[in-house]
């Protein structure tokens, strides 16, 4: 499921549990009718650049930088907030599917690729020349990730929560 499709699939009953890189946020918890049952991983958003770009830190970003990411994600919002906080004018390039983001970045359509750092590490392996890319050291967010269920089914919520707890212990 794409980031755009995931919540509809869960709320419609197409799936019973969403277990992927979905950040637990107040608005998602309160507004969409979802219940986050716990956290199984804390990630953080970062940036990947080409090693030959001369960029070694987010402090090296300049006005006009283009940044690829997934649409409909906290990553997209964090990216906007980050660049605005640094007064950097940037060109957002957003795609629905992660593979589209990877292909666009790999083809040179954007200067940087941003998502959770675990995702950057994994997606880097899909590049045509993975060793030509690096993840910058800065982390611009803290992302609590874990399974999500529809609100209103306390028994199923308990099953998923205790399954998660068992795996963590």
Task: Give the location of each predicted region.
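Bilobed "Venus flytrap"/periplasmic-binding protein-like clamshell domains
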Residues: 1, 23, 43-100, 118
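Acidic, polar ligand-binding/catalytic clefts
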Residues: 1-60, 118-141
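Short, hydrophobic alpha-helical packing/hinge segments within bilobed ligand-binding/sensory domains
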Residues: 5-9, 98-104, 110, 119-120
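Sec-exported extracytoplasmic/periplasmic mature domains
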Residues: 11-15, 23, 52, 66, ...
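Short, well-ordered beta-strand segments
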Residues: 18, 48, 66-70, 113, ...
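Short, charged, surface-exposed secondary-structure boundary motifs
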Residues: 28-32, 78-79, 102-104, 123-124, ...
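Extended ligand-binding regions for polar small-molecule ligands
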Residues: 49-55, 59-62, 71-73, 119-120, ...
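A residue-level marker of the well-folded mature domains of exported/periplasmic proteins
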Residues: 92, 130-131, 153-157
């Amino acid at each position: 499921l794409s980031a755009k499709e995931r919540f509809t699939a869960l709320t419609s009953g197409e799936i019973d549990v969403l277990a992927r890189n979905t950040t637990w946020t107040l608005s998602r918890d309160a507004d969409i009718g979802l219940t986050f049952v716990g956290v199984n991983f804390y990630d953080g958003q970062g940036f990947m650049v080409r090693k030959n770009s001369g960029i070694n830190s987010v402090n090296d970003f300049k006005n006009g930088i283009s940044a690829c990411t997934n649409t409909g994600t906290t990553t997209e919002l964090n990216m906007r907030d980050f660049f605005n906080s640094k007064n950097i004018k940037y060109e957002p390039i957003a795609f629905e599917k992660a593979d589209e983001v990877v292909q666009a970045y790999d083809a040179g359509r954007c200067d940087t690729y941003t998502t959770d750092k675990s995702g950057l590490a994994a997606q880097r392996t899909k590049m045509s020349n993975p060793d030509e890319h690096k993840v910058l050291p800065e982390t611009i967010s803290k992302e609590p990730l874990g399974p999500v269920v529809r609100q209103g089914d306390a028994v199923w919520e308990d099953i998923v929560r205790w399954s998660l707890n068992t795996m963590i212990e």
